[in-house]
Amino acid sequence: MLNDVYAAQKDGCEKAIASLKRDFTTLRTGKVNISILDHVMIDYYGSMTPLNQVATVLASDASTISITPWEKSMIKTISGAIQAANIGVNPNSDGECVKLFFPPMTIEQRQENAKHAKAMGEKAKVSVRNVRKDANDEVKKLEKDKAITEDESKKGQDEVQKITDGYVAKIDALVKEKEAELLKV
């Protein structure tokens, strides 16, 4: 019974970590990452479609993203969608593809992104703590229903806290690693 509670808690915490890693991909570091365009949606024959489903998106070098649409008629639509997404660059089109040139990041931009990384880490910790609360509530419910003893309940809550501490430490390590990457010039 308690093992089910622990498994559910670990699953919830893993989801929080996965969400944090996904959020980190939206932060720009020294080199461009094509995942910055993951949220860009294109009006493709009346339905909103992710950019990567209508074009090939590649990082040409450390500061350039090249977008080659599968249909040349989509170039104007893609350029408009990128401008509307407000990612901090203007698209340049040569008739064949759309290129995005990212200027080098300033120290202020790097520090701002490091702050965002910290805030994302705090949000993930809140998620982990909410999962802990749910797990503790489940342990207390088992005790109330006489499925486990008071001692087992106490041990169960201690184990829930150990699991939480482990995941909070993982989040702290991920945030520290991301901050170092962001602040590295």
UniProtKB/Swiss-Prot annotation:
Positions of the UniProt region annotated as Disordered: 135-159
GO cellular component: cytosol
Xref: Pfam families: RRF
Family annotation (InterPro entries): Ribosome_recyc_fac, Ribosome_recyc_fac_dom, RRF_sf
Keywords: Cytoplasm, Protein biosynthesis
Stretches of the chain forming a coiled coil according to its record: none
Keyword NAD in annotation: no
GO annotation terms (biological process): cytoplasmic translational termination
Subcellular localization, as worded in the UniProt entry: Cytoplasm
GO molecular function, one term: ribosomal large subunit binding
Highest taxon, organism lineage: Bacteria
Principal location class: cytoplasm
Family membership noted in the UniProt record: Belongs to the RRF family.
Function of the molecule: Responsible for the release of ribosomes from messenger RNA at the termination of protein biosynthesis. May increase the efficiency of translation by recycling ribosomes from one round of translation to another.
Protein name listed in UniProt: Ribosome-recycling factor
Native source organism of the sequence: Campylobacter curvus (strain 525.92)
Chain's gene name: frr
